[in-house]
Amino acid sequence: MVSYTVLLQRLRAQLHINGHLVGVAAGSGMTGTYAMMGGADFLLALSSGRYRIMGRGSYAGYYCYGSSNDITMELGTRELLPILPDAPILFGLAASDPFIHLYEYLKEIKARGFSGVANFPTIALIDGQFRLALEEDGNVYEREVEALALAHHLGLFTVAFVTREEEAEAMLRAGVDVICVHLGLTKGGFMGAKKYISIAEAQQICDRIFSLCVRMRPEAIRMIYAGPANTPLDVDYLYRHTPAQGYIGGSTFDRIPAEQAILHTIRAFKNAGRSGVSETFATEAHAPDAVDFVKQYVHEHYGREIRLRDLAIVLHVSPSYLSTRFKQETGMSFTAFLLSYRMERARALLEEGRLSCKEVAARSGYLDYAQFSKMFRKYQGVSPRDIRSSEINTSRNP
């Protein structure tokens, strides 16, 4: 077990050195082991993670197929804690469980070796008539707030999943250590959500909630969970446009990588020795999601001329389909995304101070400096020379 003080010190140090944190909702001991080897800052034992490893959807943790708390306790004590005794592992607590006494159960969680608690499954993800019926029966979000307040009192690290400002405010007043904006089920893969908000909508939600956090308790760590953000590029976008300090993933780290690795490996073995076929299947198996492919291509080649119709040909889809799909997932047109990305990268290069304004323009895909300056001012609110001059003055007068 990692103590509260030690864990908080570790996370603060990581934020200072690396700038961001990564939490992993591990559904098995194997996932947890490799997550920690990869540099995860903490693990979460959640019943939904266990169901994912069984090949079921994450929301299975919300139904009465079994006791969520019992499933989580077994996952943590039989798989995660024995092989990762020095890792910070958080317990996903179903606070509305009618068969537990919150205070006594939290003491048991701590005694079994867990370093902290998160409110999951959370009623925050339920709405409509079913939510009203649950609340009439006493299953309210305030119960989760109470649970994390008690956990904090007992010296457990606390992660609060929230979906709107009112929930974040209540959790901040309860003294939680992390506010994590839950953006819904993770998109992608065979079992991923087919309906989800765009990355631009996610940005707006995070910005509202995190702005509240900064005003109320700036020391509280601000993180994001899942939804449309399932690639490093998505998370990088949210880091650049919101005050987010970290990312927690479940399917992103255990289901999607496992789906891809198993599928690709079996196909490769299935077609081993079949001349001329292996390459075809390998290419098909590794074909990325169209929108992810476009975003990755922009990331790697933003300084070149990029046309959506050319990318559509490579992906074997129509330009109109790719354009519509891209806007649905990102909340912006391809042209707006490309321009925004180019201007963000240009600003970063200008702030580094090693290149002239014209050199930065050329690296950003602009041979006409006047056009580059015009677009930069439109997207960044200042001219390239203003940024460059500011960096020169800063270096001369540290």
Residue locations for each model-derived region?
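C-terminal helical cap(s) of enzyme catalytic domains, especially alpha/beta-barrels
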Residues: 55-63, 191-202, 253-280
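Glycine-rich phosphate-binding active-site loops on the catalytic face of alpha/beta enzymes
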Residues: 42-54, 116-127, 178-192, 242-263
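Basic/polar phosphate-binding segments, predominantly the helix-turn-helix DNA-binding elements
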Residues: 308-338, 361-383
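Active-site beta->alpha loop and helix N-cap motifs at the rims of alpha/beta catalytic domains
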Residues: 31, 38, 42, 58-141
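Terminal helix-turn-helix DNA-binding modules in bacterial transcription factors
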Residues: 296, 328-365, 389-398
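Catalytic cores of alpha/beta
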Residues: 29-37, 100-108, 165-174, 227-244
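…primarily DNA-binding HTH/wHTH and HhH modules…
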Residues: 374-398
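N-terminal amphipathic alpha-helix/helix-capping segment at the start of soluble metabolic enzymes
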Residues: 1-25, 77-86
